[in-house]
Regions:
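A generic structural signal for tightly packed, nonpolar segments enriched in small/aliphatic residues
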Residues: 1-172
Length: 172
């Protein structure tokens, strides 16, 4: 299992503006963990991208205390990707699989991204931040753009806990 970690300096140099915007309020440095299981005769490439928000306070659009209680689990998508890649490598499957795990903490501070700020994503698109608590899609878009550019996967799947609004729409 091949592993590579892109740290904050490399993320900045390579235009990961959306991911860095989410991490801007935190003292914890962001990273992008890349995992790869590549057996010799694999023909197609599957990419898995998992949301790795280690704690989600909501940023400046801060969550209420009760809504914030379980937010250390906002990295379950990342955990699934890591577990899948480790399992594939241990079982020596014949699948070529890329795992991308953007890791950030979404916190409020004087350096945090503000609602209304405009950031440039890894794909070169500009994004206006409407709500700092919609951080998952920002870190996923930078990771997905990087994976497409670098690995050109046949199939890409993202795994994430994205919004509590689905409970309003669908019920518990």
């Amino acid at each position: 299992l091949k592993t590579r970690v892109l740290r904050e300096k490399e993320l900045r140099q390579n235009g990961f503006g959306a991911l860095l915007a989410v991490a801007a309020g935190s003292r914890s440095k962001p990273s992008l963990v890349m995992l790869e299981h590549k057996p010799p005769k694999a023909k197609k490439t599957l990419a898995l991208v998992g949301k790795g928000v280690t704690f989600d306070s909501g940023g400046l659009n801060i969550k209420t205390g009760s809504s914030m209680a379980g937010m250390k689990a906002d990295m379950s998508g990342a955990a699934v990707v890591a577990a899948t890649l480790v399992t594939q490598a241990r079982l020596k499957t014949r699948n070529h699989i890329i795992g991308a795990i953007p890791i950030v903490e979404n916190m409020p501070s004087g350096t945090a991204t503000r609602p209304g700020d405009i950031v440039r994503s890894h794909a070169g698109k500009t994004i206006e931040i409407g709500n700092t608590d919609a951080e998952g899609r920002l870190i996923l878009i930078d990771a997905m753009s990087y994976v497409v550019k670098k690995h050109k996967p046949t199939v890409m799947i993202d795994l994430a806990t994205l919004t509590g609004a689905c409970v309003v729409a669908l019920g518990e």
